[in-house]
């Protein structure tokens, strides 16, 4: 029967948020992260308490502008922020010493509404 496939009620906050005091939501703008399923209008969950690791999707501030990208290190061991869009329309952001750079939080989830 269909009841066998119904899970318990889901508390969305409990599911999406690990640290309530350090978590907030950001709207996705642009298409630089579509290959990882982040589409314009989606909301991402950002946790400021998590330590960013290579390969994490992060919310970063680069020269006073926010961006969501994949945190990585280039061949020169300098940090870079990688887009996830195979169209070639977006380039990595290579962080130079003269740039203002801060990882503002780690993206831990996302969600969207259909209607």
Residue locations for each model-derived region?
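Acidic/glycine-rich C-terminal interaction modules and beta/coil loop segments
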Residues: 1-12, 16-115
């Amino acid at each position: 029967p269909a009841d066998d496939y119904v899970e318990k009620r889901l508390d969305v906050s409990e599911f999406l948020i690990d640290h309530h005091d350090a978590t907030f939501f950001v709207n996705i703008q642009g298409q630089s992260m579509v290959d990882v399923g982040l589409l314009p209008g989606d909301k991402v969950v950002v946790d400021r308490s998590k330590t960013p690791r290579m390969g994490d999707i992060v919310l970063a501030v680069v020269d006073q502008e926010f961006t969501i990208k994949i945190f990585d290190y280039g061949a020169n061991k300098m940090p870079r922020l990688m887009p996830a869009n195979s169209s070639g329309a977006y380039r990595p952001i290579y962080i130079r010493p003269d740039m203002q750079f801060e990882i503002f939080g780690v993206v831990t989830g996302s969600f969207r509404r259909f209607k």
